[in-house]
Amino acid sequence: MERVYLDNNATTRLAPEALQAMLPFLTEEFGNPSSLHGQGRAPARALMAARRAVLELIGAEADSEILFTSGGTEADTTAIRSALAADPSRREIVTSTVEHAAVLALCDHLERQEGVTVHRIPVDGDGRLDIEAYRAALSPRVALVSLMWANNETGTVFPVEGLAELAHRAGALFHTDAVQAVGKVPIVLRGTEIDMLSLSAHKFHGPKGVGALWLRKGVPFQPLIRGGRQQRGHRAGTENIPGIVGLGRAAELALGGDHGAVRLLRDRLEQGILARVPKARVLGDPLDRLPNTSCVAFDFAEGEAIVMLLDRAGICVSSGAACASGAMEPSHVIRAMKVPFTAAHGAIRFSLSHWTTAAEIDRLLEVLPPIVDQLRALSPFGAEEVK
């Protein structure tokens, strides 16, 4: 039985074109891009080409900066630490209650260990940011606003361009964790007031272990990793050329992505579930949402059990984010949205890619309803509750 993979917000399959682009730099083109001799020239050229590809994917000015990192977590950490170092008189950060752990865990540490005040803006039942609470949190004491472009669990998209404008009025820098958005929705940074953006290659069919932090031209910056002068002194250490090349090729491929086709399959999935499974609800903004992401909560069914039973049937999904999976409590995102208790424990994330097929969606729709029925029959609430 061929496996159906519907967990693309956790990671994606490496594009064959990205792999082929990487292979020479794992073999004959092994040179250090900082070397002056001939062996370093091809890696140096590849580094520049990848930088241009990423800038094009995110619609950024050619003279802005791309800082290659080990992934989204390092990019987020670098942005937050740099903003705090840029103006020591500002010791406050504004973020949201539904950010990825890469941002929230660092903010928790800064608050507990370094005396930074963190404002965590709430969201409504669809995962939309409370704009009035956001406005109220902004002040001349805020060094940085860090808000995600799109949520990794529900797919809800934040209006980051307008949020960045409000941050600048208070004199704060604006960073967006766009790890789940890049490659899935069109992004044009040119002309916006966004200062920094994080991305990760493995979320759009590039390799794991490589990401990037985009910096708007003129943004004050302090490096997280010091040492050599690689990447204009912004990140020390010999660059991961094979990974960066794979990131660049994945960026080129993502520019031609058909988001509309993925959206149609996601809608087919949601409509099919709602038609076949009573007491199911789609979580997230009904309109402003990633085209590949569907978070569905099933009343009176345990999400972890749904995941395990689907896995036995050869279908890969997740309950909440993979980074938070394993806990029996609903994720912090689901809790922040105040999803009712009976549904919160049954939240499942389905995330598609351009490789997802209609046949795979139909396979899920065949297998899922009896699994939910089976689990509800075991529920202490009883199967009668869902009728």
Curated annotation (Swiss-Prot):
Protein name: Cysteine desulfurase
Binding positions ([2Fe-2S] cluster): C323
Family under the similarity heading: Belongs to the class-V pyridoxal-phosphate-dependent aminotransferase family. NifS/IscS subfamily.
Residues with PTM N6-(pyridoxal phosphate)lysine: K203
InterPro entries: Aminotrans_V_dom (IPR000192), Aminotrans_V_PyrdxlP_BS (IPR020578), Cys_deSase_NifS_bac/arc (IPR017772), Cysteine_dSase (IPR016454), PyrdxlP-dep_Trfase (IPR015424), PyrdxlP-dep_Trfase_major (IPR015421), PyrdxlP-dep_Trfase_small (IPR015422)
Cited NCBIfam families: FeS_nifS
Record-linked Gene3D superfamilies: 1.10.260.50, Aspartate Aminotransferase, domain 1, Type I PLP-dependent aspartate aminotransferase-like (Major domain)
Active-site residues, Swiss-Prot/TrEMBL: C323 (cysteine persulfide intermediate)
Gene Ontology biological process terms, A to Z: amino acid metabolic process; nitrogen fixation
Keyword line: Iron, Iron-sulfur, Metal-binding, Nitrogen fixation, Pyridoxal phosphate, Transferase
Entry's Gene Ontology molecular function annotations: cysteine desulfurase activity; iron-sulfur cluster binding; metal ion binding; pyridoxal phosphate binding
Catalytic activity: (sulfur carrier)-H + L-cysteine = (sulfur carrier)-SH + L-alanine
Subunit structure: Homodimer.
Its job: Catalyzes the removal of elemental sulfur atoms from cysteine to produce alanine. Seems to participate in the biosynthesis of the nitrogenase metalloclusters by providing the inorganic sulfur required for the Fe-S core formation.
Cofactor(s), names only, from the UniProt record: pyridoxal 5'-phosphate
Residues holding pyridoxal 5'-phosphate: G72, T73, N152, Q180, S200, A201, H202, T238
